[in-house]
Regions:
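Beta-barrel outer-membrane channel/assembly domains of diderm bacteria
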Residues: 1-73, 94-108, 124, 132-140, ...
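Sequence/structural signature of outer-membrane beta-barrel proteins
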Residues: 2-7, 40-49, 76-84, 111-121, ...
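Flexible, surface-exposed loop regions and adjacent strand-edge segments
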Residues: 53-54, 91-93, 236-240
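Active-site cleft segment of glycoside hydrolase catalytic domains centered on the general acid/base Glu
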Residues: 86-88
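Solenoidal tandem-repeat scaffolds enriched in leucines and small polar residues
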Residues: 112-145, 150-152
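Outer membrane beta-barrel transmembrane domains
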Residues: 132-134, 144-149, 153, 157-159, ...
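Small/polar residue-rich beta-strand/coil "junction" motifs that cap repeat-based extracellular fibers
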Residues: 205-213
């Protein structure tokens, strides 16, 4: 993964190359139940030996299927909030996904976020989350969805520089359209408990990148508009100055250009 940044706020950022290895495990208990886990090295910056890379279990959960249309996950699994703009990572709790016919999918979850801004957060400082996602596939090209979540009180530093944020209810909408290798998507999210708390994103892509498909590739251009109190629970790539505690916490407006390529099956190269 190659990262290059130019500071627009008076700070300069060095280019760097990072690498990460993940190993997924899937043990089937019976026809309807599986135990799944994943080992990861975390992000390693090439040329920097000051930080020791240690493998750890970042996912471990049980997956059970009730018939063909209902799946339940319990443990530490990957949970998406809406289209993934504000969070799509590790989640400790229980989630259920149900398909209603060929077009409608419902997802509900309860638990705790444990990655992004919530990485290395104690349970006392974390807040529980109740979440509902709904998605509708209108046809093979167009789909849209909505999300609603209630976020408990947390003691975790967010993009506005504050630790105690009463986001309360978080809701949003997303949509996507694809035709051939071209795709466009967008999402808008807001928190009811704080003013100046919306975030939206529009992205376009060209290609059909899949990490399990050799020689597949894609390029993508995104625009982000993040208000200072937006409920962004993952760490966005454009927030480097925030993570270095050198920002004025006024929100972000950013363009992001990225590319992905799979030289071999299950090997991916990403640059942005």
């Amino acid at each position: 993964n190659y990262i290059g940044k130019e500071g627009g706020d008076g700070y300069d950022y060095e280019d760097k190359i990072t690498a990460r290895v993940r190993l997924g495990l899937d043990a089937k208990v019976n026809k309807t139940t599986s135990v799944k886990a994943r080992i990861t090295t975390g992000s390693i910056e090439l040329g920097d030996s000051s930080k020791e890379a240690q493998a750890n279990w970042d996912l471990a959960y049980v997956e059970h299927k009730f018939g063909k249309n209902v799946v339940v996950d319990a443990g530490r699994y990957t949970q998406k909030f809406g289209g993934g703009l504000i969070y799509s990572s590790n989640f400790d709790g229980v989630g259920a996904t149900a398909k209603l016919g060929d077009k409608v999918t419902l997802n509900g979850a309860y638990g705790y976020m444990t990655a992004g801004r919530f990485a290395k957060t104690s349970k006392a400082d974390n807040g529980d989350v109740g979440l509902i996602n709904a998605n509708v596939a209108v046809n093979d090209r167009f789909g849209f969805g909505g999300m609603f979540a209630h976020v408990g009180t947390t003691n975790v530093r967010m993009g506005n520089g504050k630790k105690n944020n009463e986001f309360d209810n978080v809701y949003g909408f997303n949509a996507k359209y694809n035709i051939g290798k071209f795709g466009i998507d967008g999402e808008w999210v807001k928190a009811s408990g704080l003013s100046d708390s919306d975030i939206w994103n529009v992205g376009v892509k060209w290609g059909d990148y899949k990490i399990n498909k050799k020689n597949s590739w894609a390029i993508r251009l995104d625009y982000f508009d993040q208000a200072k109190n937006a409920p962004v629970f993952k760490t966005q790539k454009y927030e480097s100055n925030d993570l270095l505690k050198k920002t004025r916490y006024e929100g972000y407006k950013a363009w992001q250009l990225g590319a992905s390529y799979a030289p071999e099956k299950n090997i991916g190269i990403n640059a942005y």
